[in-house]
């Protein structure tokens, strides 16, 4: 069992639970706009939080079981980063999320 992670707003996650699928790519961008959902390994979460979510309120860290994800997951290189990041190429089925933990972003 392998886990990947995604930082989500509480509002976006609540909408996903109602709809049965999560369709936000990253903060302020939808899956339709970006083409995939950004995810991270456990080691990558702090850098993502620091870079994109600094000071953001009402966040959750979604713990995603890769064995349960319906769409394709591709590990892709990001310029300037040593390790590739997992990208989910389609709506994330909420049944793949095994935990939605309260998450505090770094202060601004």
Question: What are these language model-derived features?
Answer:
Residues 1-108:
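Conserved, structured core segments of small domains
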